[in-house]
């Protein structure tokens, strides 16, 4: 992604490729891949107008296509353009909030921008169109100047804001937690197995105690269809350490329904004896282009500084369309082959993924070009605070 961004600045007609990406949203997994700032920066660098993005939003298909995937990336790009001082993007967001099929998404985007001057009059639209549930979804957890301004004008929004604040102050009764703390391990396991009221709390209490009995519970719940109870077990097991390795090795090898959790544990706590297994897993994932399956092996091999993984890491970096992998690949490369990783870290300074940019800022060799890029990242108010701070430190 970083290489493409650098090439775009030198290639005539690259703008149409940028617009095409915004229109069709090429993200492999939109839930965990970020491209809005990446495309917005390209539009700024290439001096591309926002008009074609607006044309995409207001295409007649907007009112016939029920899925919000068609406009999600375009709205994010416009929001990022506003943050990059391209204010002409704001009226497009306003107009889509007023006229678009997915008006709530645009309204939510404008609220997130936190600038009351961009949302004058939209409080009436929000109060008229949103039921109580939608208003609750519109209100962020923290202070937001747009919502505060709207609440001063609209009683329903003020009531929704009051409900959100009250919910934030509410705490779970201490008695329930104290009761779980007094139960025996066997009682907690029985409560968790019943999967009724209190089961989630019992699972987390078992996790807090780091009892190995939770591994037995995992073998019962994880092979079944996905559920919130199995998810709670996975979250609780994240607090465990190397004591889970013997079971994790069995899970990863047996494919009995717990293999994903087993691989995560091996990635986090495995030793050098696990390198051959992790290599086999990565080789298979790359060969099948099953990029979801590559995440844990990459993380583990990078942590173990397994030099034999470098060719596969380079292949994954080049071939994978799954941006979620990119921070893990770059981190693994910098740990296993620092010299080889230098060109990848330079490329990463222009990447779409926050984690890649952060690793690149920390590791890229200092040259005239990279110093200029670090300075730009430091001064970019649309950039994530952690990246700006790291860029400032490297640039000193």
Task: For the regions a language model picked out, list residue spans one by one.
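Short inter-helical turns and helix N-cap capping residues of alpha-solenoid HEAT/ARM repeat scaffolds
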Residues: 67, 99, 130, 194-196, ...
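Amphipathic alpha-helical scaffolding segments comprising HEAT/armadillo-like alpha-solenoid repeats
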Residues: 13-25, 48-63, 83-96, 116-127, ...
